[in-house]
Structures are given as structure tokens and as C-alpha cells.
Amino acid sequence: MASEGPREPESEGIKLSADVKPFVPRFAGLNVAWLESSEACVFPSSAATYYPFVQEPPVTEQKIYTEDMAFGASTFPPQYLSSEITLHPYAYSPYTLDSTQNVYSVPGSQYLYNQPSCYRGFQTVKHRNENTCPLPQEMKALFKKKTYDEKKTYDQQKFDSERADGTISSEIKSARGSHHLSIYAENSLKSDGYHKRTDRKSRIIAKNVSTSKPEFEFTTLDFPELQGAENNMSEIQKQPKWGPVHSVSTDISLLREVVKPAAVLSKGEIVVKNNPNESVTANAATNSPSCTRELSWTPMGYVVRQTLSTELSAAPKNVTSMINLKTIASSADPKNVSIPSSEALSSDPSYNKEKHIIHPTQKSKASQGSDLEQNEASRKNKKKKEKSTSKYEVLTVQEPPRIEDAEEFPNLAVASERRDRIETPKFQSKQQPQDNFKNNVKKSQLPVQLDLGGMLTALEKKQHSQHAKQSSKPVVVSVGAVPVLSKECASGERGRRMSQMKTPHNPLDSSAPLMKKGKQREIPKAKKPTSLKKIILKERQERKQRLQENAVSPAFTSDDTQDGESGGDDQFPEQAELSGPEGMDELISTPSVEDKSEEPPGTELQRDTEASHLAPNHTTFPKIHSRRFRDYCSQMLSKEVDACVTDLLKELVRFQDRMYQKDPVKAKTKRRLVLGLREVLKHLKLKKLKCVIISPNCEKIQSKGGLDDTLHTIIDYACEQNIPFVFALNRKALGRSLNKAVPVSVVGIFSYDGAQDQFHKMVELTVAARQAYKTMLENVQQELVGEPRPQAPPSLPTQGPSCPAEDGPPALKEKEEPHYIEIWKKHLEAYSGCTLELEESLEASTSQMMNLNL
């Protein structure tokens, strides 16, 4: 160290402005690895001359003073050993070694830190002896500039102090056996140590000191320029010495600190006070024995003891320091003190950044230590930097969302990687937290780069792989209570079922049928054929085989004659049953002209003409029935009946569709019509039908349980329940009248309310048609009875049904009759009374309707 240049007169003093506020840093100290060792750290008494002296008022609490201890004492009394006065091996305390020229005590600059609202646990420290010294012009200007900069860069200094402490502490570590002297010299116009440590511009950063001596001592002889200034400092008294316990072979870090809060003291530092009467002069720093203070570690804590060092003080050989004073730079010893001019003369805020740079000579000297210590120091330095940057990274850095389903969407992962490659990282060293913050702010404004085409292709591939084994047509899921319709359904049924979807099923209505729920296929599976359908298909196959075998025309003629005979056998019992009891009176009242009037029905013209020509043609075989007019029919076909049936069915269908649109559930419960052989037979057994309409051209299936047997069963149930049954319209025409695209064989009517006129007219026309059919049969029978014997065999089946009533010829008994013909004969006698009652009721109802119309 070197002395300053010319001084100003002592009368000139500078007082601090009231605007200047003290700043107490949160953490003060250098990170020095203190080793727990029983060896004492010898602190030479000559170093006391370079400490500013501040005295504390007496306190009530017990503290350890050096005068209370005997020289060479190794332990403290147990009552003084507490958690507040023991030193933790890692509790660091900064010290400053200043020359006497840098010590200025300004009146009125004492700050009280014992305010409970601001700093709890701080002790009140006042200067008992306020010493004023003249300041040079450079120091005045420097101080004014510093006070202005401190107010302006308050927050910046706080941040820099935290970072600088971490970097400096790592720089001053060296190999084992070497010593580092950290000298912090700042303007002593600031009376408190915390405010001094915040002033980064005037701080003196110590460089590496490599020495092999176990004891570090220095005197004023090494710095002759300082001896003259010591004469002016006779009034200044000793200050308490602060020092962390350290082994002899490790580093020594000395920093000046005037005030230390009790909270920091409790962490492991010990307060050592000297007698205020003690004083150290320049003569004490000579080769004579000097008084040193030692801090030694004991199981009870750290112990301070004063000893007399007999060794000669050795000047430090390698001391590199940074002094922020221009006048000292020239007079310092170049071998002992290395002062970079760029750092010593810097007073702008950039000086804080320059302090972080390690001097080249310092690097070369520090490299002489062991590599192990340097690795430790570098590792700790990295940890410090990571701690300082982690505060910002936690707040600002946010990871982008990860795409975990990389297997399902591989293109998304590729797009994200491509985007990460484009964005190159900037300022990876110190400005990385700030850049991360900026990137996060601007991330929402950047256009999102996603490969939508790749996403769509990936989804399509996944769907194709899933549905590869399934059918190409999708499955429709009906969420509600109404089933979903297929596109192929008819227009009328589609309208009705779509109306069902508007109104949900009422679960409280127990009479309502249950609606289908769940899944339904657009194209339903092929239903298994019923027993009736199986019989029909079987007979069709047999007929085809028979036609293939008998391809000759005589075979066809024989088949036709057999069909005609069987048709006559089937029809005449029915005709006898229906026309005998019901239409006898009408046959008498209506002559055979009605038979002529029904000759020209449009669709049945051929069979009607054949029936009309049977009377005059006595020589030919009487053929009444055909494929369009089956033998189960018991009435003559006419256009009037067909038109009346068509009007009735259309009206009932209109009523039913209107009800479905208003209330589908109610329309389902109160239906007007039912279609099909099986459904009609089912409701006939339940006695819910009021009328049955049968198509006259149903297919001929004579097997047991076949179509003919089912039709006869339906007619039988209708006769039992006195229900009128009408033969009208062929199958296709009957389906068209019901707005169906398929042919319909049988239709059952539940209720004809609203269409009574059409219904009664249909019944009247049906009764007349039966009478005409009965008259035709009587005429045919009379003609066949008067026929000679050769014509008897072909007429036997036609005369069979009427023989029981008229004592027919004995040839009838020789002919075998089918089983169902015998059943019809029995029904003829049993149902004669029922048919009469039905006829009377129909006549009464028609007469009432006529009276109402009048």
C-alpha cells in the first residue's frame, strides 16, 4: 500500500447529506472455506494500526473482552460459551485493512441500527471519539460523485453486491499453504460497514497472496509512505478486531466491519473488544516482539487469546490489490503491490463489471497452488453462479408443452423439433434469464408451425387400420329412445319414424310398447325365415323341379286339370259356407243380372268371363277359379268393392300418419291397421280386429302349415268372431293403397272410426258379391246335375260341397276329399246360426245409417 498525495488543510471537513440513506445488505461476507482446526490464527498487532477505531458503548449483556482473559488462555469459561458467541465454521465475516490515510470520521454520520421497525437485533454503535481529517480535493469530488451514484443506482448495487461477493470469494481461494489477503479500502466517510460494502466503486479487492509462512504479519516498514501519516492519527483508538478462525496453513480473509448485527453474531461470530486506552503507534510495527491475537477452536467453541509473537514480521511478497485511489498508484511498491490503472482510476458504473475480471498476474500466481483446491474453487464458483441465476429462471423460464402421444402423432413431434432447431439460443452466459423472459413474452406472437397435413394423414391411417377388418358402412348409434332409420326405408315409414324421434318414450305409460334402444344397423341382418316361409320356399323348389322333369305339354295340361279340380274342391265348401246361410235371401231378391254386372272387373275380367260362360256351356268343364281368383275366395270380385276398399284403407292410413306426427307413442298404442299373415292371425286370436281384407291372388301352397292352411285358419277365426272378411285387390294393389312398396296379402283393421261411410259401403258391396257368387254356383250345380254320365267325373269335385244338403249322386262318396274340405263342411253346419246373426246385425246398422242420412 502507498500513501496518498498532498492533503488539504484539516479545517476542511465534509458532512454527509441527509438524503443519503444507509444500506444494509442482506448477506455480507466472502465465501471462504474455513477449516476447523485447533491451531490458532495469528493476527499481528501491527495490523491494528491500519484499522479504523470505533468504540461501542457499554452493554448490559455479558461479552468477552480481551482484557478479561489471561494471555495464553485456551478455553473460555462455560458461562460465556453460548450459541451467540460461537463461530460456525462457515459463518464468514468481512474485514477491511485500510491505511490511516483512508480513515475519516465525519461528525454526524452515526446511524442507529437498533430501531425495532427496521433492523431488529442491531446494536447501537456510536463513535466516542469523532476524528476529522482533511480530505484531498480528489476525495471530495469522488465522494460527491459517489453519493450521487449511490442514490441513483441503489437497486443495481444491491444486485451487484450479491454477485460480486460470490465471484470474489471464489477468486481469493488458492492452494493449501498459501495465504490470500483481501483488502477492502473504501471511503471512511461512511461510518457503518454495511454502507461501505454497498459502495462498489471504492471497494478494494484483494488478490491472491502466496506465502508459505504459518503466520502472516506486516509492518509499516514495508510501506514507508504511510509512516508520515500515522503521526496525525494519534487520537484514533483501537477498533475491535474481527476475524474468523482459520488454520495456519489456509487462507486469511480480512475485511473491515464497524457494525455487526446481533442476528449475524448469533450465527457463529465472536465479538472481541480491546481496552479503549490501548493505542498502537508506528513504533509497534518494527522488528521487536508484537502482541498478536489468536482465535483457536476448542470443543466448547472458538477462543480468542493474546500472545506475544517473537518472530520478525515479514513483508508480504506477493500482494495484489485494487485500490480505487489515483494518488496511491504511483508510490506503491511494484513488487509488492500491483495496481491496474484501469481499475484504480475507474469511477463510473462500469467499474463494477471490471472488478469481476481476474488480473493476469493473479492468475499466474494462483496457479502455483494445488490443482485440487482450484477444482474445488471452480466448482463452488459454478454453484454460486447457478444460485444467482436460478432466482430468475424459476420465475421466467417455462417449458413448452410436451407431446406425449408421439406414437399416435409422429408428425407433431417432428414439427416441434424443427421449430426448436430454428430458434437458436442467444446470450447463454449472463443474459440467459432475460432472454428466456423475452422469448416467453413473444412466444404467443410467433406463428405456430404445425403440420396439419401430417396430422390428418396420421389420423386417416389410424382410422383405416382400426376399421380394416370391419365393414365399410358405419354403425349408427341411437342415443334416444327412438331407433335410427336406414336410408333404404320407404318414404311413408320414414316420415312416421322420423316423427317418433321428436317425442321421447314416456316411461310412466305402461300400455305403450317398449321402443328400441341402443345400436341399430343401417342395413339389418337377413332375418331367418319363419316356418311358414320355409314351407313356401320348399314347395317352390319342388315345383321347379317338377316343371323341369315334366317339360312336355301334356304334363302341363294334367297339372292344370289337377289344379282346377283341387281349386274346385277347396272353394266349394267355402262358398257353401258363406253363400248358403248369408246370401240366400239376397240371391232370391237379386237375379242373375248381378252376376252379369260383375263380369267386367278390370283385373279379374278373364276369370269372371269364364264363370259367366259356364252356365250356357254345358258341354265344357266349368272352371271358376284361377291363379288370380283363388279357390279360398267366397265372393265375386268387382271394381266397386276394390274402389271402396282402397278409399277405406287410404283414409285409415291418413289418420294413422296424422296421429304419428302428433303423438308417436299414442299412435303406436292406438293403431288403425296391421299387415301380414302372422300379425293378423295373432290379433285375431286376441280378438282385437274388426275387419279383415284378403287379397284373392295369394300363392298356392297346399302343404300342411303352408299358405292355404294359414288363410283358412284366418277365415275360420273371422267366422267365429262374426268379423266381416273381404276379398279385394291383388297383392300389389293392396300394398300401394297402404303406401307400401311391397305386396301385401292380408290387412287387419283395428278401428274404422272416421271412415264409417266407406266401411258400411264396403260391407254392403261385399254381401252383394257373395250373393252373386252363390247364385253362380247354384246355376253351375243345376247345369252339372242335368249333365249325362260322361260329364259327371269332371263335375264331381264341383258338386261335392252341395251334396250333403241335396243328397248328391253316389259318385261323390267314391272321390276322396282333402282333410280341410271335411273341416269346412263341419264349419258350415256349426256357423250357420252365427252367420245369420251377423247378417241381421249388418242389415240393422245399414238401415240406421240410411235413416240418419235422410
From Swiss-Prot:
Biased composition (Basic and acidic residues): 536-547, 593-611
Any one GO molecular function term: RNA binding
PANTHER family according to UniProt: GH01354P, SELENOCYSTEINE INSERTION SEQUENCE-BINDING PROTEIN 2
Region ranges (Disordered): 332-351, 356-394, 417-445, 488-619, 787-812
Disease with which this protein is associated in UniProt: Thyroid hormone metabolism, abnormal, 1: A disorder associated with a reduction in type II iodothyronine deiodinase activity.
Protein name: Selenocysteine insertion sequence-binding protein 2
Amino acid composition bias (Polar residues), ranges on this chain: 338-350, 361-372, 426-445, 548-559
